[in-house]
Each structure stands twice: as structure tokens, then as C-alpha cells.
Amino acid sequence: MFKYVYHASRVIFGGWWLYSGAMHFISPAWQPMGHEPAAIAFTHALIDSGLFRWVKILEIVLGITMLAHRAMPLTLMALVPINVVIVYWNLVLDPATVDYVFGALSIVFNLVLLWPWRAHFYPLFVGRGGADYGLQPA
């Protein structure tokens, strides 16, 4: 059963990432700026600095890899920091019922998508390890 929940979440979330990233280039006016001054200022700062364009490019690339079900551990690792900012924006900077729902769904989708790949992330939590300084692939 979880396999179907996983794949449904992957398609929905991947589609959302692709859509959200592409809409920035198709119709820039579509971008929600928020209703609270902090959310508006934050979004303007991202846009004015040029960082927002790179985030949207990443959203497109990662949405495609998620929909194609390729490089999932790397895709998820790249999406989590972006999601942390989005959840913060939804829950703290621009709090409203719809934003709470989107923030909560982002967390749920992340957990559902990360769970089957958890074994790939365990090595990242090694407290002390031996580095391999050789030039040969591991």
C-alpha cells in the first residue's frame, strides 16, 4: 500500500515542483508574493538578488528528476533545503489557513518520499569516519 502512496506523492509533488518552477518563466505575475509585509519583503529580496531565478531552475530540474524517478536520493537532498524555506514562508512569514495546509503537505510529502530511501542517508550521520583520499572511485 505504501508503494502506491509513495508513487502518488512523487507524481503530485514532482508535478508541483515542475509547475511552480516553470510558471516563474511563463507568467512571472503568477508568483504569490504573500499578504504579510515580511513575506512580501522576503520574496522581493529573493527576486531582486537573482537567487529566485536559480531556485526556480532547480525546481524545474528536480521536478523532472522526481517525475522520471531518477537520482531520487540526490533529488530529495536538494529539495529539502528549498522545502524548509517554503515551509517557513508558509507557516511563519505568511500565516493563513491555505498556507498552513501547503506547509503541512510539504512536510508530509517530504517524509513520504524520503522514507523509502532512508538507507541511502544513514551514512551521512556517521560521527567519525575514515576519509578516502585516493583518486580511484569508491
Residue spans for each PLM region:
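Residue-level signal for transmembrane alpha-helical positions in Major Facilitator Superfamily
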Residues: F13, L58-E59
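Generic transmembrane alpha-helix motif of multi-pass integral membrane proteins
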Residues: I60-L67
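Glutamate identity and glutamate-enriched acidic tracts
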Residues: E36, E59, A131-D132
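Alpha-helix C-terminal capping segments
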Residues: L46, L67-A68
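Membrane-interface interhelical connector segments
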Residues: I26-L46
